[in-house]
Amino acid sequence: MSQTAKVLLINGPNLNLLGRREPGHYGHQTLTTIVDELTRNATQAGVTLEHIQSNAEYQLIDAIHATDAQFIIINPAAFTHTSVALRDAILGVAIPFIEVHLSNVHAREPFRHHSYFSDKALGVICGLGAQGYDFALQAAIKHLSDKH
Protein backbone atom coordinates (compact mmCIF):
# COMPACT_ATOMS: atom_id res chain seq x y z
CA MET A 1 0.00 0.00 0.00
CA SER A 2 1.16 3.50 -0.76
CA GLN A 3 2.65 5.53 2.08
CA THR A 4 0.29 8.33 1.07
CA ALA A 5 -2.92 6.40 1.82
CA LYS A 6 -5.13 8.57 3.99
CA VAL A 7 -8.19 7.90 6.14
CA LEU A 8 -10.43 10.67 7.44
CA LEU A 9 -11.98 9.94 10.85
CA ILE A 10 -15.12 11.99 11.50
CA ASN A 11 -16.81 12.21 14.90
CA GLY A 12 -20.07 14.06 15.29
CA PRO A 13 -21.81 15.97 18.06
CA ASN A 14 -21.22 15.30 21.74
CA LEU A 15 -18.45 12.78 21.14
CA ASN A 16 -16.09 15.35 22.64
CA LEU A 17 -17.75 14.35 25.94
CA LEU A 18 -16.70 10.70 25.74
CA GLY A 19 -15.44 9.35 29.03
CA ARG A 20 -17.92 11.35 31.08
CA ARG A 21 -21.16 11.31 29.06
CA GLU A 22 -23.34 8.27 29.78
CA PRO A 23 -20.45 5.82 30.22
CA GLY A 24 -22.94 2.96 30.40
CA HIS A 25 -23.68 3.54 26.72
CA TYR A 26 -20.43 5.01 25.44
CA GLY A 27 -17.70 3.66 27.72
CA HIS A 28 -15.03 5.37 29.80
CA GLN A 29 -12.41 6.13 27.15
CA THR A 30 -12.06 9.71 26.01
CA LEU A 31 -12.14 10.64 22.35
CA THR A 32 -8.52 11.79 22.62
CA THR A 33 -7.47 8.34 23.85
CA ILE A 34 -9.38 6.61 21.05
CA VAL A 35 -7.95 8.88 18.35
CA ASP A 36 -4.40 8.61 19.71
CA GLU A 37 -4.58 4.80 19.59
CA LEU A 38 -6.06 4.81 16.08
CA THR A 39 -3.38 7.22 14.90
CA ARG A 40 -0.65 4.90 16.22
CA ASN A 41 -2.27 1.90 14.53
CA ALA A 42 -2.67 3.76 11.24
CA THR A 43 0.93 4.98 11.30
CA GLN A 44 2.18 1.43 11.93
CA ALA A 45 0.23 0.35 8.83
CA GLY A 46 1.68 3.18 6.72
CA VAL A 47 -1.58 5.12 6.62
CA THR A 48 -2.16 8.75 7.55
CA LEU A 49 -5.17 9.31 9.83
CA GLU A 50 -6.79 12.74 9.88
CA HIS A 51 -9.44 13.48 12.49
CA ILE A 52 -12.20 15.98 12.97
CA GLN A 53 -14.78 16.16 15.73
CA SER A 54 -17.40 18.85 15.66
CA ASN A 55 -20.76 19.63 17.11
CA ALA A 56 -21.44 21.76 14.01
CA GLU A 57 -22.76 19.95 10.97
CA TYR A 58 -21.30 22.44 8.50
CA GLN A 59 -17.76 21.87 9.82
CA LEU A 60 -18.05 18.14 9.17
CA ILE A 61 -19.43 18.81 5.68
CA ASP A 62 -16.59 21.24 4.93
CA ALA A 63 -14.03 18.64 6.07
CA ILE A 64 -15.57 16.03 3.76
CA HIS A 65 -15.55 18.44 0.83
CA ALA A 66 -11.90 19.38 1.46
CA THR A 67 -10.43 15.94 2.13
CA ASP A 68 -8.04 14.11 -0.13
CA ALA A 69 -8.53 10.92 1.89
CA GLN A 70 -9.24 7.65 0.13
CA PHE A 71 -11.47 6.34 2.92
CA ILE A 72 -13.74 7.76 5.63
CA ILE A 73 -14.61 6.32 9.03
CA ILE A 74 -17.57 8.22 10.44
CA ASN A 75 -19.43 8.20 13.72
CA PRO A 76 -22.13 10.72 12.85
CA ALA A 77 -23.52 10.47 16.41
CA ALA A 78 -26.90 12.25 16.59
CA PHE A 79 -26.53 13.34 12.95
CA THR A 80 -27.02 9.65 12.08
CA HIS A 81 -30.76 10.08 12.42
CA THR A 82 -31.17 13.62 11.11
CA SER A 83 -28.58 14.74 8.58
CA VAL A 84 -29.43 14.43 4.93
CA ALA A 85 -26.81 17.16 4.33
CA LEU A 86 -23.99 15.10 5.83
CA ARG A 87 -25.12 12.04 3.87
CA ASP A 88 -25.16 14.09 0.67
CA ALA A 89 -21.66 15.40 1.38
CA ILE A 90 -20.25 11.88 1.64
CA LEU A 91 -22.09 10.73 -1.45
CA GLY A 92 -20.94 13.85 -3.28
CA VAL A 93 -17.24 13.04 -2.84
CA ALA A 94 -17.75 9.34 -3.61
CA ILE A 95 -15.27 8.16 -0.95
CA PRO A 96 -15.98 4.73 0.54
CA PHE A 97 -16.87 4.84 4.23
CA ILE A 98 -17.67 2.78 7.29
CA GLU A 99 -20.22 3.95 9.84
CA VAL A 100 -19.27 3.38 13.50
CA HIS A 101 -21.30 3.68 16.70
CA LEU A 102 -19.99 2.98 20.18
CA SER A 103 -23.34 1.75 21.47
CA ASN A 104 -25.71 -0.72 19.87
CA VAL A 105 -28.13 1.78 18.36
CA HIS A 106 -30.62 -1.02 17.63
CA ALA A 107 -30.93 -1.83 21.34
CA ARG A 108 -31.75 1.76 22.24
CA GLU A 109 -34.61 4.19 21.67
CA PRO A 110 -36.60 3.65 18.45
CA PHE A 111 -35.56 7.02 16.98
CA ARG A 112 -31.94 5.77 16.99
CA HIS A 113 -32.75 2.77 14.80
CA HIS A 114 -32.79 4.72 11.51
CA SER A 115 -29.56 5.84 9.87
CA TYR A 116 -29.22 8.12 6.87
CA PHE A 117 -25.81 6.51 6.22
CA SER A 118 -26.08 2.74 6.63
CA ASP A 119 -27.54 1.98 3.21
CA LYS A 120 -24.56 3.63 1.50
CA ALA A 121 -21.80 2.52 3.89
CA LEU A 122 -19.32 -0.19 3.00
CA GLY A 123 -20.11 -1.51 6.47
CA VAL A 124 -21.60 -0.57 9.83
CA ILE A 125 -20.03 -1.38 13.20
CA CYS A 126 -22.05 -0.74 16.35
CA GLY A 127 -22.20 -1.83 19.94
CA LEU A 128 -18.53 -2.77 20.33
CA GLY A 129 -17.41 0.39 22.10
CA ALA A 130 -14.10 1.97 21.18
CA GLN A 131 -12.93 -1.32 19.66
CA GLY A 132 -15.37 -0.66 16.81
CA TYR A 133 -13.13 2.16 15.60
CA ASP A 134 -10.16 -0.20 15.45
CA PHE A 135 -12.17 -2.75 13.47
CA ALA A 136 -13.20 0.00 11.08
CA LEU A 137 -9.59 1.10 10.65
CA GLN A 138 -8.50 -2.49 9.96
CA ALA A 139 -11.24 -2.80 7.34
CA ALA A 140 -10.27 0.54 5.77
CA ILE A 141 -6.61 -0.51 5.55
CA LYS A 142 -7.62 -3.84 3.97
CA HIS A 143 -9.88 -2.04 1.50
CA LEU A 144 -7.12 0.39 0.54
CA SER A 145 -4.50 -2.35 0.18
CA ASP A 146 -6.85 -4.44 -1.99
CA LYS A 147 -7.24 -1.47 -4.33
CA HIS A 148 -3.47 -1.05 -4.83
Curated annotation (Swiss-Prot):
Q: What InterPro entries does the entry give?
A: DHquinase_II (IPR001874), DHquinase_II_CS (IPR018509), DHquinase_II_sf (IPR036441)
Q: Where is this site: Transition state stabilizer?
A: R21
The residues responsible for catalysis, as annotated, are Y26 (proton acceptor), H101 (proton donor)
- Record-level GO BP terms: amino acid biosynthetic process; aromatic amino acid family biosynthetic process; chorismate biosynthetic process; quinate catabolic process
Q: In which pathway does it act?
A: Metabolic intermediate biosynthesis; chorismate biosynthesis; chorismate from D-erythrose 4-phosphate and phosphoenolpyruvate: step 3/7
Catalyzed reactions: 3-dehydroquinate = 3-dehydroshikimate + H2O
Name the SUPFAM superfamilies for this protein. Type II 3-dehydroquinate dehydratase
Q: How does it assemble?
A: Homododecamer.
Which NCBIfam families does the annotation name? aroQ, PRK05395.1-1, PRK05395.1-2, PRK05395.1-3, PRK05395.1-4
Family the entry assigns: Belongs to the type-II 3-dehydroquinase family.
HAMAP family for this protein: AroQ
| Record's protein name | 3-dehydroquinate dehydratase
